[in-house]
């Protein structure tokens, strides 16, 4: 999200301090008196430059790669970018063309894919070029501000969307009958709009005077102002991460409690057959009372099984969605936490004008964060059968009748579930 690039025009300051051979007038001076005298040829400017060289050179380090390293790094980063574009584009296309996937809760999935796709298209290519030329910003001061704005807004939108998804899944599991947003497309669209509005609130301050970006020759770095750093990292990462962890902790507890209520036992399929309702006609009237009572109990149990089987299906589907999003949140934390820890500490260690952190470390953690935009669609495709099937059909250019094929596959899966010996204790 945050990019720091280094200037190449800085050179070490070489200072030569000359002292003349002491004359006879100086020979009688005490050693302490002689040492306090200023060297004869040393100027005020030399002393000022000497004091500056005692401080760490900020922004001097470059990424120096050999030809082979540049090729390998360029290929790897380009593959990450291309796969990120392809994966997130497939998610958006799949939700748009498949009726089964056009659910209000999937608006958030599309928003997440759009944010990740924007990172891959508008941010990653410029970071690749900057890294391959050693860390120098080659695109000018004006575009530096545009680039930082796109970087911050898209990455923040991705993170905040994950946060809203966690809240959506939690409410969907704990309040499946009363949570209206899952059936209300307009309300979900408003939530997506709020996510992008909050992302813009972090992007705009440096463009309007508060906490200006570090934008000098061949250097493009987001503002290192202390207040802005605390505000931006808290809103963009720490608060959303805390909300996600709390939501999934509650989801885990709720799923565990629900699992205890939905223990499965094998119930003989005899009681689900229609023949059970005809037994009383085959028995004598006087000997039918106990049998009739048993038949009524079995009939009620059979009806209860059929009624609750639908609830079981919903319960399993929500559990799977929670597990999928739990993995996504875990991947998000792994990818972004190291970078944001470094970004938060950087201005307090290096000051507000530049970065003194090891450049290779910064770039590695930055690309680890960008990789999260690649991981998200892969996780969805792996855990969502409908999305995975749609991906496969799109990659094989089988666009026609895709909704019909998905409906047939879903019906086949439903029949397989119906044939299982399931019940509720």
From Swiss-Prot:
CDD domains (alphabetical): 7tmA_5-HT7 (cd15329)
Extracellular domain ranges by topology: 1-72, 130-141, 209-226, 349-359
Span of the signal peptide: none
Location(s), subcellular: Cell membrane
UniProt-annotated binding residues for serotonin: 151
Gene Ontology cellular component terms for the protein in this record: plasma membrane; synapse
Domain comment in the entry: Specificity for G(s) G alpha proteins is determined by the length of transmembrane regions 5 and 6 (TM5 and TM6).
Record protein name field: 5-hydroxytryptamine receptor 7
Organism: Xenopus laevis
Taxonomic path: Eukaryota, Metazoa, Chordata, Craniata, Vertebrata
């Amino acid at each position: 999200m945050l990019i720091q690039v280094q200037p190449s025009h800085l050179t070490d300051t070489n200072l030569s301090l000359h002292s003349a051979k002491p004359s006879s007038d100086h020979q009688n001076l005490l050693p302490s008196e002689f040492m306090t005298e200023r060297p004869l040829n040393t100027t005020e400017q030399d002393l000022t430059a000497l004091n500056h060289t005692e401080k760490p050179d900020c922004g001097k380090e470059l990424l120096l790669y050999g030809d082979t390293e540049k090729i390998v790094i360029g290929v790897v980063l380009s593959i990450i970018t291309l796969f990120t574009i392809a994966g997130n584009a497939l998610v958006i296309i799949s939700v748009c063309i498949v009726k089964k996937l056009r659910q209000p809760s999937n608006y958030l999935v599309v928003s997440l894919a759009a944010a990740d796709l924007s990172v891959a298209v508008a941010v990653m290519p410029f970071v690749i070029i900057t890294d391959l030329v050693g860390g120098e910003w080659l695109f000018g001061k004006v575009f530096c501000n545009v680039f930082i704005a796109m970087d911050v807004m898209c990455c923040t939108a991705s993170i905040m969307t994950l946060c809203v998804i966690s809240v959506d899944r939690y409410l969907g599991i704990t309040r499946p009958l009363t949570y209206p947003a899952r059936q209300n497309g307009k309300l979900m669209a408003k939530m997506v709009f709020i996510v992008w509005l909050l992302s813009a609130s972090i992007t705009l301050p440096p463009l309007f005077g508060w906490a200006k970006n570090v934008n000098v020759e061949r250097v493009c770095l987001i503002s290192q102002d202390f207040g802005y750093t605390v505000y931006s990292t808290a809103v963009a990462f720490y608060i959303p991460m805390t909300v996600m962890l709390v939501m999934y902790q509650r989801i885990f507890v709720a799923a565990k409690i629900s699992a205890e209520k939905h223990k499965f036992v094998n119930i003989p399929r005899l009681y689900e057959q229609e023949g059970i309702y005809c037994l009383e006609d085959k028995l004598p009237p006087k000997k039918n009372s106990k049998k009739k009572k048993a038949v009524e109990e079995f009939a009620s149990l059979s009806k209860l099984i059929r009624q609750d089987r639908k609830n079981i299906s919903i319960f399993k589907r929500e559990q799977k969605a929670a597990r999928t999003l739990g993995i996504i949140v875990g991947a998000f934390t792994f990818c972004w936490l190291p970078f944001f820890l470094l970004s938060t500490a950087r201005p307090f260690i290096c000051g507000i004008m530049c970065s003194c952190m090891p450049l290779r470390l910064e770039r590695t953690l930055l690309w680890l964060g960008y990789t999260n935009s690649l991981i998200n669609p892969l996780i969805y495709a792996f855990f969502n059968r409908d999305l995975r099937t749609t991906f496969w059909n799109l990659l094989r250019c089988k666009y026609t009748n895709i909704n019909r094929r998905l409906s047939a596959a879903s019906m086949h899966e439903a029949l397989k579930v119906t044939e299982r010996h399931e019940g509720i204790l």
